[in-house]
């Protein structure tokens, strides 16, 4: 329906009740003339309102134009008549002045109570007033106004504001979640794209001939055979594994008893300092996930000739010689190429050097003794007569050895356990359980304490930016902002209680 801003009265000029004692024509004429005069009075009143508003706007516009003209004149004088050679502007004077910043007022609240036109306000005041339900507001427990249940002009604005604030909160939660995922996965943005597979490399290999393709396929990325394996710092090939590819046994050994191969779980790791010499004849047999036997179960390895000392392979330097073994109270066992029982893994023992003087690299750690020699006791059961030999340092640092007691060889008693609750002296004071301890436990468990001044906090939020322009500008700033820091203005606890 159209909104009537100005109503000219009376609407009907001739609709009047005529008296019965006078002439009808004369009465009708007089009544019509009087109503016409009244309508002209209404028109003159509305014309005064219209032209008065136009005059007010014109005067405000004229004042703005005059102010702008004065500023333009001052700027023109400074631009045209200022001589930079005579008048020097100090740097301090420039820094003390504030930069120009225009303050643009946004047009909003177009349909507010204060922006109502005068005729519309008069029409509104002529209507019946709502019942005085606000007198019941002090008796409500929820603190809401009773009149808002009858009529609430700000209902739609409050509904829209709640929706906008909820959307802003959801956007901030999503951005905070993405930032957290980005911090947890720093390499997420640096994902390498998958390489496109083409047959160009294959045709490049086949360009020189089929025999070169096979030789290139055998070699690894560094030019060595693809079957090269590494063990204890040495390089060897599985294809060259034979009886002559292992170091010779010591000269004092007369026989060696073969034993079945061990699995990876029962085989102890060799020390890191002792490695195989990097020559052409020695290698490792670790070609798969499981270790294989170092010797054949039926044939002992023959000793290589000592007339020609092994020369180091070019490109690989032999490892340094280990220090001499410390004195031991227990005579060292004579090593052999056989293994002991699978259930008793041997401890690492000091290395034995070959009698040849030209042999610079140390041999690999000897295997456990055969059944012909007595089994040496483990390091944990050595008597205290002699200091236990320091084991060679493995790659990961192991736990320190247990302390030993006297000559009985038993480990020293562990430190006494802490006194139990039964042995602790009971305090005469009872356990303190008051509101402070409960408060501390609640804070530690992460519970959010209920705010005491919820109403004041809500009033503060309503005062700051409770209009359409501020809410929309905040929403746009949140959506298009790329800052990494979380603003306290959009914190979760600030908008939801």
From Swiss-Prot:
- Biased composition, Pro residues: where in the chain? 298-335, 343-403
Q: Which gene encodes it?
A: Wasf2
GO cellular component assignments: basolateral plasma membrane; cell-cell junction; cytoskeleton; early endosome; lamellipodium; ruffle; SCAR complex; synapse
Family to which this protein belongs: Belongs to the SCAR/WAVE family.
Q: Name one Pfam family in it.
A: WH2
Compositionally biased spans, kind Low complexity? 252-263
Q: Which UniProt keywords apply?
A: Actin-binding, Cell membrane, Cell projection, Cytoplasm, Cytoskeleton, Membrane, Phosphoprotein
- Gene3D superfamilies tied to this protein: 1.20.5.340, 6.10.280.150
Q: Which GO terms describe its molecular function?
A: actin binding; protein kinase A binding; SH3 domain binding
* WH2 domain boundaries: 435-452
Q: Where in the cell does this protein reside?
A: Cytoplasm, Cytoskeleton; Cell projection, Lamellipodium; Basolateral cell membrane
Family matches, as InterPro entries: SCAR/WAVE_fam, WH2_dom
| Function per UniProt | Downstream effector molecule involved in the transmission of signals from tyrosine kinase receptors and small GTPases to the actin cytoskeleton. Promotes formation of actin filaments. Part of the WAVE complex that regulates lamellipodia formation. The WAVE complex regulates actin filament reorganization via its interaction with the Arp2/3 complex.
**Disordered: where is this region?**
173-203, 239-436
The primary location reported for this protein is cytoplasm
Modification sites for Phosphoserine: 473
**Its quaternary structure?**
Binds actin and the Arp2/3 complex. Interacts with BAIAP2. Component of the WAVE2 complex composed of ABI1, CYFIP1/SRA1, NCKAP1/NAP1 (NCKAP1l/HEM1 in hematopoietic cells) and WASF2/WAVE2. Directly interacts with BRK1. Interacts with human cytomegalovirus protein UL135. Interacts with FNBP1L (via the SH3 domain).
- Domain writeup: Binds and activates the Arp2/3 complex via the C-terminal domain. Interacts with actin via the WH2 domain.
Q: What is this protein called?
A: Actin-binding protein WASF2
Q: Which GO terms describe its biological process?
A: actin cytoskeleton organization; actin filament-based movement; ameboidal-type cell migration; angiogenesis; cell motility; endocytosis; lamellipodium assembly; lamellipodium morphogenesis
């Amino acid at each position: 329906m159209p909104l009537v801003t100005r109503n000219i009265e009376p609407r009907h000029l001739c609709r009047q009740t005529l008296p019965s004692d006078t002439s009808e024509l004369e009465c009708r004429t007089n009544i019509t003339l009087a109503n016409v005069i009244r309508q002209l009075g209404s028109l003159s009143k509305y014309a005064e309102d219209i032209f008065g508003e136009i005059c007010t706007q014109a005067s405000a516009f004229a004042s703005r134009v005059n102010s702008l003209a004065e500023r333009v004149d001052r700027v023109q004088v400074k631009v045209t008549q200022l001589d930079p050679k005579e008048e020097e502007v100090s740097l301090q004077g420039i820094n003390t002045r504030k930069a120009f910043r225009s303050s643009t007022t946004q047009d909003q609240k177009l349909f507010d109570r204060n922006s109502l036109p005068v005729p519309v306000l008069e029409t509104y005041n002529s209507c019946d007033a709502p019942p005085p339900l606000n007198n019941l507001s002090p008796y409500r427990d929820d603190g809401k106004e009773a009149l808002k249940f009858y009529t609430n002009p700000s209902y739609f604005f409050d509904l829209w504001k709640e929706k906008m604030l909820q959307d802003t909160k959801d956007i901030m939660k999503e951005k905070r979640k993405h930032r957290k995922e980005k911090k947890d996965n720093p390499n997420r943005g640096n994902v390498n794209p998958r390489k496109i597979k083409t047959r160009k490399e294959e045709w490049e290999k086949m360009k020189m001939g089929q025999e070169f393709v096979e030789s290139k396929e055998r070699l690894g990325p560094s030019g060595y055979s693809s079957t090269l394996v590494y063990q204890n710092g040495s390089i060897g090939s599985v294809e060259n594994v034979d009886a002559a590819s292992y170091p010779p046994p010591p000269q004092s050994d007369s026989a060696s008893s073969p034993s079945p191969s061990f699995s990876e779980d029962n085989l102890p790791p060799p020390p890191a300092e002792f490695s195989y010499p990097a020559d052409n004849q020695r290698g490792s047999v670790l070609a798969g996930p499981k270790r294989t036997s170092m010797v054949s179960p039926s044939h002992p390895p023959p000793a290589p000739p000592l007339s020609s000392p092994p020369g180091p392979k070019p490109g690989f330097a032999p490892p340094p010689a280990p220090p001499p073994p410390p004195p031991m109270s227990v005579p060292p066992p004579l090593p052999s190429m056989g293994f002991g029982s699978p259930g008793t893994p041997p401890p690492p023992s000091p290395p034995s050097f070959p009698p040849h003087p030209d042999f610079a690299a140390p041999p690999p750690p000897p295997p456990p003794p055969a059944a012909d020699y007595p089994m040496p006791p483990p390091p944990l059961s050595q008597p205290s007569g002699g200091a236990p030999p320091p084991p060679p340092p493995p790659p990961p640092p192991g736990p320190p050895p247990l302390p030993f007691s006297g000559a009985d060889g038993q480990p020293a008693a562990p430190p006494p356990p802490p006194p139990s609750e039964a042995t602790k002296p009971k305090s005469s004071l009872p356990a303190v359980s008051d509101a402070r301890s409960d408060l501390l436990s609640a804070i530690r468990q992460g519970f959010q304490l209920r705010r005491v001044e919820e109403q004041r906090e809500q009033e503060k939020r309503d005062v700051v930016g409770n209009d359409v322009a501020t809410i929309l500008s905040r929403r746009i700033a949140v959506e298009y902002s790329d800052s990494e820091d979380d603003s306290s203005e959009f914190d979760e606890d600030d908008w939801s209680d």
